[in-house]
UniProtKB/Swiss-Prot annotation:
The protein's name in its UniProt record: Phosphoenolpyruvate synthase regulatory protein
EC identifiers of the protein: 2.7.11.33, 2.7.4.28
Transmembrane segments: none
Species of the source: Escherichia coli (strain K12)
Function: Bifunctional serine/threonine kinase and phosphorylase involved in the regulation of the phosphoenolpyruvate synthase (PEPS) by catalyzing its phosphorylation/dephosphorylation.
HAMAP family the UniProt entry points to: PSRP (MF_01062)
């Protein structure tokens, strides 16, 4: 067996496999193991299911260790094929549905693609999500200052502190219209809140980052440049944090947080409603 991998983990679904991945990752994060992940969406027919079973079995025979299989599959005939594999199979949805069925005294009506599929009865939410993504892309990195009043949150920060990925995650995951505005080196001699942002101060949220981490990120982009120097990064971070404090702008240090954690903290601090899709 590959010494760098403790377990092979499959995430299998007749839909996008997002639910299987999210719940499976949450479970596996509780164990001190290194995993090799294999995600297999849209396992919708018996031929595809048999190919997946063969893939699971091949890894078992190669390694001698049962792969872990997290699955979410509606059709019983497809499930049956996966369960015949040499993997240790866990139906992540049924594990929650069964006790709820007993508690609510209702029978579930499972439908493939229901969790992350496009529901004809839910097109307004889908359209709102796409509009949020379009808005966020159009207002990335200060590209456009038009219609900033339509933003639900405006992220501020120095270059490469995480504004763009956080904005896009907010838009794609929660349908939040998130603009972001960069403070660049040329701003630092007299750093003030831009006039275009002052009327929208209630929508502003700042990001900062440890200078050492910022320098490492910038070095990958512009090696041996003033832009990536630790001295420059320390100066920019200090100036921006002083601006946040002076203008009472809420802010967090993004250094030790994932994009998901940063976005969730922003939603909580800014009082924005979460919309799941």
């Amino acid at each position: 067996m590959d010494n760098a991998v403790d377990r092979h983990v499959f995430y299998i679904s007749d839909g996008t496999a997002i639910t299987a991945e999210v719940l499976g990752h949450a479970v596996m994060s509780q164990f001190p193991v290194t995993i090799s992940s294999i995600t297999l969406p849209f396992v919708e027919n018996e031929s595809r299911a048999r190919a997946v079973k063969d893939q699971i079995d091949a890894i078992y025979h190669q390694t001698g260790v049962r792969p872990l299989v997290f699955y979410s599959i509606v059709l019983p005939e497809i499930r049956a094929i996966i369960l015949q594999s040499e993997g240790f199979c866990q139906d992540i949805v049924q594990a929650l549905v069964a006790p709820l069925q007993q508690e609510m005294k209702l029978d579930p009506t499972p439908i493939a693609h229901r969790t992350h599929g496009l529901n004809p009865n839910n097109l307004n939410k889908y359209d709102a999500r796409i509009a949020a993504i379009d808005y966020t892309l159009a207002h990335d990195d200060g590209i456009s200052l038009r219609n900033l009043d339509q933003a639900q949150v405006i992220l501020l920060g120095v270059s490469r502190c995480g504004k763009t990925p956080t904005s896009l995650y907010l838009a794609m995951q929660f349908g939040i219209r998130a603009a972001n505005y960069p403070f660049i080196a040329d701003d630092m001699d007299n750093l003030v809140l831009p006039a275009s942002l002052k009327p929208l101060q209630h929508k502003l949220f700042g990001l900062t980052i440890d200078p050492e981490r910022l320098a490492a990120i910038r070095e990958e982009r512009r090696e041996n440049s003033r832009y990536a120097s630790l001295r420059q990064c320390r100066m920019e971070v200090a100036e921006v944090e002083a601006l946040y404090r002076k203008n009472q702008i809420p802010w967090i240090n993004s250094t030790n947080y994932s994009v998901e954690e940063i976005a969730t903290k922003i939603l909580d601090i800014m009082g924005l409603s979460r919309r799941m899709y």
